[in-house]
Amino acid sequence: MADSEGTDGEGTGCNGWFFVQAIVDKKTGDKISDDEDENATDTGSDLVDFIDDTTTICVQAERETAQALFNVQEAQRDAREMHVLKRKFGCSIENSSEKAAAGKKAKSPLQEISVNVNHPKVKRRLITVPDSGYGYSEVEMLETQVTVENTGNGDSNGSVCSDSQIDCSDSSNMDVENIVPTSPTNQLLQLLHSKNKKAAMYAKFKELYGLSFQDLVRTFKSDRTTCSDWVTAIFGVNPTVAEGFKTLIQPYVLYAHIQCLDCAWGVVILALLRYKCGKNRITVAKGLSTLLHVPDTCMLIEPPKLRSGVAALYWYRTGMSNISEVIGETPEWIQRLTIIQHGVDDSVFDLSEMIQWAFDNDLTDESDIAYEYALIADSNSNAAAFLKSNCQAKYLKDCAVMCRHYKRAQKRQMSMSQWIKWRCDKIEEGGDWKPIVQFLRYQGVEFITFLCALKDFLKGTPKRNCIVLCGPANTGKSYFGMSLLHFLQGTVISHVNSNSHFWLEPLTDRKLAMLDDATDSCWTYFDTYMRNALDGNPISVDRKHRHLVQIKCPPMLITSNTNPVTDNRWPYLNSRLMVFKFPNKLPFDKNRNPVYTINDRNWKCFFERTWCRLDLNEEEEDADSDGHPFAAFKCVTGSNIRTL
């Protein structure tokens, strides 16, 4: 049997713990050391100076000396910085840096400086000492303020400069008797910190100028609303900057009326400005803030009252006095409201004058009349009275209805030659009739044949009352027909409305009618129901909400891709239509413009050159003294002219 691993016999042999004790025997005759006393008791006194600590004491003393020196240097540096800051911000300092250092000896610099912007104590401004420079900077610095703070022991006072509060000792106290209680900047800061800034500015404005700011302006709720005229009240402007405001604002405005008054807040500027282009309130505020170095929160910006006679009179009277500086021409609304006669006329509105204006300008649509008449309110007293009226919608409807009646009656009394002459007088000179002739030749139409057909067409000769332009697509049929329709101010009818009983109602008020792109179903309808209309004979037309009216159908121009004369489905149309074929496509230049220009001026030149050919030289029995085919229409009473 094998022996067990490891060692056996626990605690025996060399495998356990054992104790070794050295035994020294002193023998007789051994030499004893001189510095060792064998019989003396060991007290440990020989180890007292074993470690030399003199070096540590010297280092500690040096550190304490350096700390004290550092404190003194820091106090002196703080005093110098305080002196520079007080001089920079206009504060007077009466204590030397040595006194400030002595007062701070008991405190460390970190304990002396405490940031306390919103200090609850009373803040007072130090006396401003004149500096060698002129002014501080372009941006006005915050005034230095002093806060007197009494602690529980009553041995410390503080002064605040800008946003930092630095405690000073009793020896460095400022002279409280020489402190000015208020200053323009402090007042302005109070304005900025007030709960209702606008109310404070309104009150100050009324106190200075003697009237409310709201008496001069109207209110824009949105800051994005654009206007060219603005009234601004700017508070707390530096006097030097205020003197140059007239020169600074001149490149941006067409008119400027500037007034400046001094108060405890500084200079308050009241200005009426007319900019070269429309601006909103935000843009105006940014521009003025850049020029005057005043935040936009210290400004009142609103548009002026354009219809207030009192406000206009204020600007007019103050503009003539020496308290205002005026640049540019006076706005028209001030001139208009300061004329006595105009002010009297504004109170009376004359509907007949409005109708006469709409008639002279060929306006029959209610929307067009309302918009155009409102635009001339600055120069027309009756239009201004119309805008002030509470019955604008009623007046507008009555004006449009009466104008249409007058226009309809006038047109009915005019023959075709008179109407063409009237239209030619309305169009500018400078046209050329050759493009029309060249286009007809390009399409293979004989010019003399076309003139003969056009003469019968304009006279409304029976069986010759309708011209048809037929041919493939894109040959210029609609282009040619629409240009003639526009010149003669005709009307368009569409077969898509043929299911309505009133689709022919436009024929009652026009000298010419056009139906564009007639299809087979349209020709079938004409062959069934419109034979008399194509003949040029009287027909009965149904009108909406009105009784039937009997009229002679005006000349009708029709375009189509189908030739109705060659089609056997409509045999009764052959003798009632004058057909001209347009087989060639309309040519365009490289800019996609028609090669043959056909417009109102060219048609005017065409009718003037072919006037005799078309037999339009009828004797005008009703011509007035100016040579017009009829007398000028007047629906307003004339005024007697008093001669000298």
Curated annotation (Swiss-Prot):
EC number, UniProt record: 5.6.2.4
PROSITE patterns: SF3_HELICASE_1
Keyword Ubl conjugation part of the UniProt annotation: yes
Region described as DNA-binding region: spans on this chain: 180-346
Main location: host cell
Localization per record: Host nucleus
Crosslink site: Glycyl lysine isopeptide (Lys-Gly) (interchain with G-Cter in SUMO): K552
GO cellular component, one term: host cell nucleus
Domain SF3 helicase: 445-595
Subunit structure: Can form hexamers. Interacts with E2 protein; this interaction increases E1 DNA binding specificity. Interacts with host DNA polymerase subunit POLA2. Interacts with host single stranded DNA-binding protein RPA1. Interacts with host TOP1; this interaction stimulates the enzymatic activity of TOP1.
Family under the similarity heading: Belongs to the papillomaviridae E1 protein family.
Protein name as catalogued: Replication protein E1
UniProt organism field: Human papillomavirus 59
Gene giving rise to this polypeptide: E1
